[in-house]
């Protein structure tokens, strides 16, 4: 019996999940909507770039919440009907300049808590007070004013560690309020570099050979972030500007500690490189490999014709990475 186009085939393929990634930049709101079935291909459903009113943003801070809410409404106004009639998981990013991160040995936190370093699952909940103490220390704020995320890093290492990220609660509350004013319910808030890295890693899985060493670089309004990826694992990272680096080229050389790269994938607002006298080709020269700009257009089938410039702009990395999180979780 043929099940093509039948309800039984739809059940076998799994429910189609829809997710939106929202990137609030200094001058634009960028929206990417994707969908995917459990074992199916990724579909690009909708893209939109909406300019923000001048003065709406001041660094990481939302100054004019009404202007941001209007831009969000405009970005979602052209949402295809098929997206509007499905549950849409929406994620938004917090700029890295508003987020502080640290890595702490698990054993040290365990010694301050009532759980063993080798415990897992529920037992690790005992780490929470010690984690909050570390977050207060790096942020210089009391815990009631902080939003904190943390996890045990499972990457192979001689010492197990805990990754901690903290941001002022006001940054999250402002984004949640703007989204709610626009009629949008957020299911997740992520950091810009993490969302961009997720997008770049996905691009590598589609465009590069398996196990091919590569560099992932993201250019944001507050700096340049880079990662070296070998056998699917992040083995090195860099950030610029940073006190230890004289210039961007010096920072990029931090990634050259392992195997030679075959390729560097570059996302973000690449035009900002002009401000430090750099270019896409210069990144490739420093890393000793070809440099390819990130493009959403290459990463999924198009459910319908898409004409927004974001389809081919490296600046779409954060919004795409946020949307990708929604269909993968």
Language-model regions: role of each:
Residues 1-329:
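Hydrophobic/aromatic-enriched cytosolic interaction surfaces used to assemble or bind macromolecules
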